[in-house]
């Protein structure tokens, strides 16, 4: 044990937090989570241990701007102005200091290992009583599961130790410091330490004791470590559970270890042995270790599909059977290996349906509770995710247990990122930083290696590639050859990774960056000598309205076996709740706390909002990742299962044929499909529709019974086919009414019954409509070529740094947002049964014509206005965001009804999950409340739209809400939006894709850009 004086002054003088060679003082060795049961039955059933006591709750807290400001007296007693805070928590969430959001740039001046003199310091204290029996025998430990970023610990005024690495436990022996009755802990937490240079992850930078604190009492002679490994024969019919157990304390001949394996109430296998291992070298073997091997016949294998778990109980006892203590863990029999370029689980090639997940809560910062963890897992499972990458640090210990039990594959990642270094590997190639990096990797492995859900180790994130990585890669491969290691830094295919694991590599497009090129994922597989599997560690940047082009990745994954999936970036928006002057909550992002530097809304890349409400893009991910694929041939549906291990035992295929959303026939068939099997389903002869419209066949896989992760009736997969379009049209009855045209100096006015249309002759726009005496328009009907920029349109542009390649900057520079209409033509003609208005506009900026829009409006005796639009696009202007029409309707109706793709928001490059049907939703549901306002709510493939008294028909895309594109563009946060008068309607003949391969470079694929020179579309607008 390291001994230093107890005084605060000496601790401050040592400045351990600015020495990369000091990562801990007196911290105990890493190991799996312990509970020290004194009853083996309680260990088997995982009951709360009487030897494990939580110290979570209210602690006294005082905040100081620097450690030097902390008074020495605090070590002995609470300060008079101390506050009370809840542990675990981040102190920034209690109003102390400010959270800082930055992606790459370090939040402190880069001068490793030194940190600013102004180093916010939180002083925690807790008074507690100790059970006297704990003082009489054994060892009492204190466990801090997570403290950011470094801390010193005192107990009863005496210095205990020091720890850093904010995402792994720091555990200390308190036995020599405790006394009968009342005891006092004092914890001095520093916001910045040399460890902060290894923790430059894209996240909020927060501080404090943010994970659980507990006391653990272990006997003097104790289990100090245990590791379980599962081994198999070739066909997995026989397995061996290998358990290596290490003890600490007096090594006596009478000591024995028994390992028993349980499946529920049934003991499957058991073995007992004394300590003493195999001979290692000429000096012998480990006297304090023993390895037991238990044979298991026909084990029920673990996978994310079927997370079969056993329970291993490790008992330390004497020869006569007297139990000293027991530890236990869940065991999943599974094998992970790479063979012939494929990542295999239990001999089957995996397809990773993965997502990156930060530990984030909008109210609690980086504090994770069980309810939130379970909620995340259930949502992932319900949306066909099977894997999660712990980005970019080891998670709360409970997370892994939950992943074991619910079934998720886990990439466990070391808490190492040096993204802001220049070059990135400045520290990771420096041997002075090897000890700090080593502790972060080795302690992660030692804590988490017993979890079957952990199938891959990761050396960290975005830290370049240095010699330290190579050393740690070799250490893991030596200590745990049962799992592959991945690491993206330095080019994604270095010697420190078993898996090619690029981030944001595209399907077909190379990105030839200097030194670290990102090849297309298809090309990467074919590079000379390359035989590793490729799994994208990050892809499909889900920032705001994004995930365009996601289907293209999944087409490639299914086409090329060695393209084994990837991890979407990322799971949850990292917005935080703030309150306005009236106490109303709102969602904040970088800069909203006065934090500098900051990267604004770049913290919000989630498939779900911070409160776990899904983004529309989540449905697209669910659909592309679904485990059932469908093919239609005639009246035969072929259903293929992509499950590797699971037989469909809780699925029905529901099918329905509908004409323009009206059901004509339906049925339900039980699915009986084995792993990777097929089932043919023959549909009956379908009825012939009697009216015109689109005929669609929709199939849905429905789970009739609830599961551990879904409710009864859960839909896990679906597909639609357009069968035909019935052209047996009933002609409208002839109208004897003829619209009347009147012309004034300023307007053309058309009147039919109680309806009137007014076209302004100076502007050429439809300026007003009346039904009776009620005006229908608040603004004229005008062309629209722009959209409120998406995050993907903005890229890295900001006020102080313009990216001229970003779509929004190209549109601005070309004048798309500033363009004004010059009237070229506005004429009116009376036809035999209609009035025809003809207009032409040149949309110009600074004398340059960007678009020419020619329209005809034909108003007939039925009151239908047929609008034909022809648009010519200048050859030297950027491809526009949309080609359509917009106006502000006077009407505000509660509901919107449409025949088209839905129900969720969809865009041309993100619509495979949408279904063609007749949908009816509240107006409020047509707006997607992205925290950073942008273009949103589009519905594609629309044939008919009904809103209030109005109906539009054609083949178009639309969005409708209380917010104008102008307001969306000018507003920084959704809570600042105000409902405008009336309703804004945007009807597009064409709309550009949204992209999403990444959010910092133009990522809309060419096929989803509006690159043609001419466009035509038609609408029918009438009143019902």
UniProtKB/Swiss-Prot annotation:
Pfam families: Bgal_small_N, Glyco_hydro_2, Glyco_hydro_2_C, Glyco_hydro_2_N, LacZ_4. It is an enzyme of class 3 (hydrolase). GO terms for molecular function: beta-galactosidase activity; carbohydrate binding; magnesium ion binding. SUPFAM superfamilies: (Trans)glycosidases (SSF51445), beta-Galactosidase/glucuronidase domain (SSF49303), Galactose mutarotase-like (SSF74650), Galactose-binding domain-like (SSF49785). The record marks 358, 392 as: Transition state stabilizer. InterPro entries: B-gal_small/dom_5 (IPR004199), Bact_Beta-galactosidase (IPR050347), Beta-gal/glucu_dom_sf (IPR036156), Gal_mutarotase_sf_dom (IPR011013), Galactose-bd-like_sf (IPR008979), GH-type_carb-bd (IPR014718), Glyco_hydro_2 (IPR006101), Glyco_hydro_2_AS (IPR023232). Binds 2 magnesium ions per monomer. Binds 1 sodium ion per monomer. Mg(2+) 2 binds at residue 598. Its EC number is 3.2.1.23. It catalyses: Hydrolysis of terminal non-reducing beta-D-galactose residues in beta-D-galactosides. It comes from the Bacteria. Na(+) binds at residues 202, 602, 605. Keywords: Glycosidase, Hydrolase, Magnesium, Metal-binding, Sodium. Its cofactor is Mg(2+); Na(+). SMART domains: Bgal_small_N (SM01038). One of its GO terms (biological process) is lactose catabolic process. Coiled coil: none annotated. The keyword Hydrolase applies. The active site is at 462 (proton donor), 538 (nucleophile). GO terms for cellular component: beta-galactosidase complex. Homotetramer. Belongs to the glycosyl hydrolase 2 family. NCBIfam families: PRK09525.1. This is Beta-galactosidase. It comes from Escherichia coli O6:H1 (strain CFT073 / ATCC 700928 / UPEC).
């Amino acid at each position: 044990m390291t001994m230093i004086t107890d005084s605060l002054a000496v601790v401050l003088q040592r400045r351990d937090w600015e020495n990369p060679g000091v990562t801990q003082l007196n911290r105990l060795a890493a190991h799996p989570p312990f509970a020290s049961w004194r009853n083996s039955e309680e260990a088997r059933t995982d009951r709360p241990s009487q030897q494990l006591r939580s110290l979570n709750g209210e602690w006294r807290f005082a905040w100081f701007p620097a450690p030097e400001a902390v008074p020495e007296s605090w070590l002995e007693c609470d300060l008079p102005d101390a506050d009370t805070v809840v542990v675990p928590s981040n102190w920034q969430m209690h109003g102390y200091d400010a959270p800082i959001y930055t992606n790459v740039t370090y939040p402190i001046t880069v001068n490793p290992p030194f940190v600013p003199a102004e180093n916010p310091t939180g002083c925690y204290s807790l008074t507690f009583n100790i059970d006297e029996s704990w003082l009489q025998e054994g060892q009492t430990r204190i466990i801090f599961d997570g403290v950011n970023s470094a801390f010193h610990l005192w107990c009863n005024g005496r210095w205990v130790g020091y720890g850093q690495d904010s995402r792994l436990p720091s555990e200390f022996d308190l036995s020599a410091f405790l006394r009968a009755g009342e005891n006092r802990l004092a914890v001095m937490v520093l916001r910045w330490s040399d460890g902060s240079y290894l923790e430059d992850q894209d996240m909020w930078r927060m501080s404090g004791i943010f994970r659980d604190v507990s006391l653990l009492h272990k006997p003097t002679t104790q289990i100090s470590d245990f590791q379980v490994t599962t081994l198999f024969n070739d066909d997995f019919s026989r397995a061996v559970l290998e358990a290596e157990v290490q003890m600490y304390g007096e090594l006596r001949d009478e000591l024995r270890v028994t390992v028993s394996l349980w499946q529920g109430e049934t003991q499957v296998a058991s073995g007992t042995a004394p300590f003493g291992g195999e001979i290692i070298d000429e000096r012998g073997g480990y006297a304090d270790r023993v390895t037991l091997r238990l044979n298991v016949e026909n084990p029920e294998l673990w996978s994310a599909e079927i997370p079969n778990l056993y329970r291993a109980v490790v008992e330390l006892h004497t020869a006569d059977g007297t139990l000293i203590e027991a530890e236990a863990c869940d065991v999943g029999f599974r094998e992970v290996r790479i063979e012939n370029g494929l990542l295999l689980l239990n001999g089957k090639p995996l397809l990773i349906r993965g997502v990156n997940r930060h530990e984030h809560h909008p109210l609690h910062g980086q504090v994770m509770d069980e309810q939130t963890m379970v909620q995340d897992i259930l949502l992932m499972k319900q949306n066909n995710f099977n894997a999660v990458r712990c980005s970019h640090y080891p998670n709360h210990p409970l997370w892994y247990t939950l992943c074991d039990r619910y079934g998720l594959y886990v990439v466990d990642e070391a808490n190492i990122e040096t993204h802001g270094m220049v070059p990135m590997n400045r520290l990771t190639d420096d041997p002075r930083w090897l000890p700090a990096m080593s502790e972060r990797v080795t302690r992660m492995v030692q804590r988490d290696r017993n979890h079957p859900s952990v199938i891959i180790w990761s050396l960290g994130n975005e830290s370049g590639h240095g010699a330290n990585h190579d050393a740690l890669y070799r250490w893991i491969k030596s200590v745990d050859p049962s799992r592959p290691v991945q690491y993206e830094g330095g080019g994604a295919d270095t010697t420190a990774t078993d898996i090619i694991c690029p981030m944001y590599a595209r399907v077909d497009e190379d990105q030839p960056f200097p030194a670290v090129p990102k090849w297309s994922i298809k090309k990467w597989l074919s590079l000379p000598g390359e035989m590793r599997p490729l799994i994208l560690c990050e892809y499909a940047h889900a920032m705001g309205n994004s995930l365009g082009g996601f289907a293209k990745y999944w087409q490639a994954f299914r086409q090329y076996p060695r393209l084994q999936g990837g991890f979407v970036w990322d799971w949850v928006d990292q917005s935080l709740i703030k309150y306005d002057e009236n106490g109303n909550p709102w969602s904040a992002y970088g800069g909203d706390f006065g934090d500098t530097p900051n990267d604004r809304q770049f913290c919000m890349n989630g498939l779900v909002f911070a409160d776990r409400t899904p983004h529309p893009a989540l449905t697209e991910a669910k659909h592309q990742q679904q485990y059932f694929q469908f093919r239609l041939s005639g009246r035969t549906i072929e259903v293929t299962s992509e499950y590797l291990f699971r037989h469909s035992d809780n699925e029905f295929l529901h099918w329905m044929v509908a004409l323009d959303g009206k059901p004509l026939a339906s049925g339900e068939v039980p699915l009986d499909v084995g792993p990777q099997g097929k089932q043919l389903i023959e549909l009956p002869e379908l009825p012939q529709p009697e009216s015109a419209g689109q005929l669609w066949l929709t199939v849905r896989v429905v789970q009739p019974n609830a599961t551990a992760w879904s409710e009864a009736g859960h839909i896990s997969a679906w597909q639609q086919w357009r069968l035909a379009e019935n052209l047996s049209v009933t002609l409208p009855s002839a109208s004897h009414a003829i619209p009347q045209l009147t012309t004034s100096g300023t307007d053309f006015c058309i009147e039919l019954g109680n309806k009137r249309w007014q076209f302004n002759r100076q502007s050429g726009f439809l300026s007003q409509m009346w039904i009776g005496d009620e005006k229908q328009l608040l603004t004229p009907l005008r062309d629209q070529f722009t959209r409120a920029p998406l995050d993907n349109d903005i890229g890295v542009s900001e006020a102080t740094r313009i990216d001229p390649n970003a779509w929004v900057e190209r549109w601005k520079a070309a004048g798309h947002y500033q363009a004004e209409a010059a009237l070229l033509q506005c004429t009116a003609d009376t036809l035999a049964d209609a009035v025809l208005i003809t207009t032409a506009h040149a949309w110009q900026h600074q004398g340059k014509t960007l678009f020419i829009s020619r329209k005809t409006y034909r108003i007939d005796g039925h009151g239908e206005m047929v609008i034909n639009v022809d648009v010519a696009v200048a050859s030297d202007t950027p491809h526009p965001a949309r080609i359509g029409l917009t106006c502000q309707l006077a009407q505000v109706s509660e509901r919107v009804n449409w025949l088209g793709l839905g129900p969720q928001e969809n865009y041309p490059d993100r619509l495979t999950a949408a279904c063609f049907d007749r949908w009816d939703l509240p107006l409020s549901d047509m707006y997607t409340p992205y925290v950073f306002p942008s273009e949103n709510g589009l519905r594609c493939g629309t044939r008919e739209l009904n809103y209030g008294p109005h109906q539009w028909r054609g083949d178009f895309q639309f969005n409708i809400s209380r917010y104008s594109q102008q307001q969306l563009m000018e507003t920084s946060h959704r809570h600042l939006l105000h409902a405008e008068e009336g309703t804004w309607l945007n009807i597009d003949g064409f709309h550009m894709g949204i992209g999403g391969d990444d959010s910092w470079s133009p990522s809309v694929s060419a096929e989803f850009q509006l690159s043609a020179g001419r466009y035509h579309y038609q609408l029918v607008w009438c009143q019902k």
